[in-house]
Amino acid sequence: MRVAGPAIPYVQSSASQDVPPPYHFPDVTVQAFIWPAQIGAVQKYCDNFLNLGTREERGFEYRPLAAWPYAMLLFLDYPEMISSSREPEDIGETPYPERGITSQREVFACLPVVRYGNGPLGLIADTDIECVLPFIVVSKPWSCVCGREMLGLGKLLAEIDMAEGYYPDSFRGAVRLPGWASDAPGEHLSVLPFLDVETG
């Protein structure tokens, strides 16, 4: 939603925690897993996080994609991450495209949903298949900040392991997130297991 009046311009500085887009990510490796989704659980997610207010106020309605009732889990390994911005930068420092590289790991779940428009015309012109991400985690803080500030993705910082499993050409992945082991008063924040995957 736009607010009347002048917008505050974004100013890049050498103290920024984000790196300006666009980005170049060569040689990304993806491990993808697909499993049947519980349609009722997907609808509940849509109602809790996407279908806010009344349908008339929103102008749309999210529902599960019943024709393809599956969920996806993806592990991504980015060996090189480079800013490929061609815009001139006047920050008094080396431009980001001329700096070194970084790497990261990323894990997210993906649910295919349908965004239905309102009314007969809306059903034809404003209906689209989209993907929602119930969670997305990354292993590097810069990617976490850029994902939130530049792309609007609620990325969380996590510890992510990716390696070959016990058998040749198998895969093993794990995610650990900050949290509390119990609701007891005084419980100290620690890094807890969140997700483990291993193929045979």
Annotate each language-model stretch with its function.
Residues 1-91, 103:
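Hydrophobic, proline/glycine-rich low-complexity stretches
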Residues 108-200:
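Internal, well-folded beta-alpha domain core
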Residues 94-95, 107:
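Membrane-lipid interaction segments
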